[in-house]
UniProtKB/Swiss-Prot annotation:
Single GO molecular function: transferase activity
Name of the protein in its database record: Large ribosomal subunit protein uL2c
Pfam families: Ribosomal_L2, Ribosomal_L2_C
Disordered as annotated region, ranges: 35-57, 226-262
Single GO biological process annotation from the record: mitochondrial translation
Disulfide-bond pairs as recorded: none
Organism: Staurastrum punctulatum (Green alga)
Amino acid sequence: MGIRSYKAYTPGTRNRSVSQFEEIIQIKPEKKLTYGQHRQKGRNNRGIITSRHRGGGHKRLYRQIDFRRNKQGIIGEIQTIEYDPNRKARICLTQYSDGEKRYILQPRGIRIGDQILASPDAPIVAGNTLPLTNMPLGTIIHNVELQPGKGGQIARAAGTVAQIVAKEGLLATLRMPSGEFRLVSQKCLATVGQVGNVDANNESLGKAGSKRWLGKRPKVRGVVMNAADHPHGGGEGRAPIGRKRPLTPWGRPTLGRRSRPRHKYSEALILRRRKNA
């Protein structure tokens, strides 16, 4: 996938770079696998903001993605490679030999006409899905389950990849995309290979309007607010925050304070925390 950069025709195109979408084949999605969705826009059932900086954006149709990959022993053929507005990764329309069609995440290197298989005996080829116990050490994987049968939850974003680094007993040790080392049951399914669209992080929006198209609203710094609106606010002119440590708008410590619960059930499964933690 290539990245197209713009010349500085306007201030908005000076730093703008977008995907060329050269691998996109299908324009309209499969109608039976799409449905409308009401986006919450950061509001709860009473219409009160519970998550700031969300709202607006272009209307989207949700594509139903097969994260479980539970069509065991049935060969599927890649029919199309499509754009999905709900994620950075591309998606593939797969038609199985029994006639059913499903969307899957596009693994890197997959082309139209390639065949994929979900089976315990499937070969170690990009796009195939099998249990971790049947994969050799060092295999790079994506769409990894945390609980057997629940569906893939790890390494689903564009360009992400996890790796099997060890196996012992009923558990396998994975190196996560964040750098964290975590234990996962060897019964969990995973898909071989890396998620496609690896250059997604190299795109630059270039202007504020592009972020509004994505449904993201402006983030105002607390230091420029009034003292009544934020603990960092107030003062004469450009003033420091006036506190020992940064605080949230509601007075809680932030920017460095760990927010993960201390006694979470999965704490014993994490061998090494992520790199930037």
